[in-house]
Amino acid sequence: IKEIRPTLMCSVPRFWEKVYAGVQEKINETTGLKKALMLDAIRVGRIHNLDYLRLGKTPPVMNQLKYKFYEKTIYSLLKKTIGIENGNFFPTAGAAVPDEINEFVHSVGINMVVGYGLTESTATVSCTLPVGYDIGSVGVVLPGIEVKIGEDNEILLRGKTITKGYYKKAEATAAAIEPDGWFHTGDAGYFKNGQLFLTERIKDLFKTSTVSYTHLRAHET
C-alpha cells in the first residue's frame, strides 16, 4: 500500500481492524500531551463526521476549526503511515464491520463505504451513502435490484444482475432460486430506516472478518 498509495482501495474489514488495533496500541504507549491530542482528535472527528456530517448537519464552528487542525496533523500523519493519504474512496465488504471500527475509521476522516454483495449478485447489492447512513448497516439497495426478507429473516434477491443459476448444477440452482426468480442468499437480515442490516448466516457456515468460512459445529464441539 505504501508503494502504491492508492486513491481507491477495496478491502475486507480485517484490514481496518488491524489499523484500529495499531492506533490503540500507539495510544496506550503514549503519555502526556501527545496522548491527550490523539484522543481528542478521535473525539473531535467523531463529533464532526458522525454526529453532524453523517446526519446532514453543519458542525459547530469550534469543532470545524479543531477538525481542520487535526486534519493537517494527526489524521494526515495516520493516513501517510498507512499509505492512504491520496485515497478518497474505500469500499469494504466480505464480513461484518464492528461498530467501533466503523466509527473510528470515519472519525479520522477516512471515507469507508460499507457494502453487501455476493458472487451470485455480480458483487454489490447495497452500500452506505455519504449522508444518512446508520452505523452497522450495509446501506441502501442499489437501483435495479429487488431485496425482500423471507422466511427465517433470510435476505432474498431478484434482478438483472442476479445469477440465473449454477453451471451444470440443476439441483443447486433449483434449491437456490425460486420459480419467480428470487435468489436465496443464506444470509439473515432486516430493513430499518430504508437500510439493510445483516444479522447472521442461516446456513451452517459463517464468514469471519478475513472472509474465510468456518463451520459452526466445529465451534460447538
Describe the residue ranges of each PLM region.
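Gly/Ser/Thr-rich phosphate-binding loop
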Residues: 2, 7-10, 21-133
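Alpha-helix capping and helix-loop boundary segments enriched in small/acidic/polar residues
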Residues: 7, 210-211
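Alpha-helix/helix-capping structural signal
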Residues: 14, 95-96, 161
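Residue-level "edge-of-site" marker
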Residues: 14, 118, 220
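Switch/connector loops and helix/strand junctions flanking conserved nucleotide-binding motifs
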Residues: 17-19
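Conserved ATP-binding/catalytic segment of the ANL
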Residues: 141-208
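Conserved small/polar residues in nucleotide/adenosyl-binding loops
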Residues: 214-221
